[in-house]
Each structure stands twice: as C-alpha cells, then as structure tokens.
C-alpha cells in the first residue's frame, strides 16, 4: 500500500512538473517587461506610450527607474538602469552589473506580487558587424546572447564564461517587422579590441552590446522567456571610431526604437510564446 502511494505521489509530482514547464508555452502574453539601459534610449518610447513613473517599484537604495502602463491589452513595465552615483559621474549605468541587478529585482518583485512577467524584451542600441550584413539603423532581434570578454581558460569554466543563452524564438515577429535575426555578443567595453575579436567571431555575433547577456541570465533565473530588440548605431568592424559613430546615430536609433517597440508589443500581446 505504501509503495503504491509512493508511486502515485511520484507520478503526481512528475505531472505537475510537466504542466509547469508547459505553462509558458501555452499561456497568452499580457504582462511584458522591457529592459532598456540608457535614459536616451527609453525616453521616446516611454513618452510615446504615456507610461508613468513608479517611484516605489525599486528599493530606494538603487538607482533604477520603472515606468508602467498599458498598451492595448498588455501591461507594460519599462525599467532603466538610472544614473551613476557610486562614482559621482552622473552618466547612465551601462554594462552588465546594473543590467543584471535591475532585471533580477524587477522579475523578483513581480513574481512575489503574483504578477509574474510573461515575457522580457531587452531593447536598446548596439554595434553591428558589416561581415554579417549589419547597417546603421537596422533592427535586429536576437536569436541568442553570449559574452566575448569573460575569458576563463579553465576547461570547466569556458562555457560558463561564454555564457551562451538562446533567446525565445521570434521568427514570425522578425518577418512582421522586416527585422534581421542574429546573435548579440556582450562585453563591458564600448570600443572594439583585437583581443575580443576572435571571441566575437566564435560567438557568431551579428551585433554587440553591453547588457544583453546579463539581462538574459537574470531572466533565466526566473524562467521568463526573453529576447532582444537592437538598433544598430555603429559598425564594429568599420572604419569610424565607435564612440563617434555611436553618439552621431544615438538620436536616430532611439527614434527607431520608439517606432519599432509599439509594433513589437502589438504583435506579441495576446499571443502564445510559440506563436512569436
């Protein structure tokens, strides 16, 4: 009798796990988080949709900002990394550390409040590789993310250092937007150095940024499907200095994001994940 009960309990647990793993695939998307590193990247979109600041969303010790509202049938939460106060520079908190912390805290808060995110979109600017067909202003949707500057030459640590994570599949969305698809490689430096070059090639990178891999990692910890929407501001393997090209095209890229993101939300809202 005890053995039969144990088998029944085991079967019930397995069934529960299977149902839980399939919930994401079969549930409709109506609660979306959009993680954007820089204020200049986020502001046009936030203003366009009239999203409102939520000053109680993050702990007061953090520099992060949240904006909430609705677009169609979707609840939206836009989070940005805020400005640096630790080093007293006042610049945007770019890079993997603030991106991972902001994303983790966002998904944690929403999960604990029984308001779990159905999808996370990492939106922002990026460098593009001309060898992969990238041009200034192109919109890319990520197929995967990886790191190009976490070099840990110890066998078991190599895959951890690269940290490759697949994005949720968005082929239908790419066709709808006429966007390109590709891998986003992440590092904590804006410029391009030869020491990173081979790692970017190994990652099969189409675009390069400073946050995507960190945001994907935080999303994975909360089992939230994720992908990136990236607009090219500079050509990594081109002739112009990255910083000059970046600032030259940042305004145009932010406007392109403003135009693309509502279309992204319109497409994903009320769809199942396997329809993206």
Enumerate the predicted regions with their spans.
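Cleavable N-terminal signal peptides of Sec/SRP-targeted secreted and luminal proteins
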Residues: 8-24
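Short, conserved "active-site rim" segments that organize catalytic pockets and cofactor/ligand binding
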Residues: 31-55, 64, 71-75
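Prokaryotic Sec-type signal peptides and long signal-anchor helices
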Residues: 22-23, 49, 71, 250
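Glycine-rich phosphate- or other oxyanion-binding loops that anchor nucleotides, phosphorylated ligands
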Residues: 29-31, 59-275
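Short linear motifs in intrinsically disordered
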Residues: 23-26, 52-60
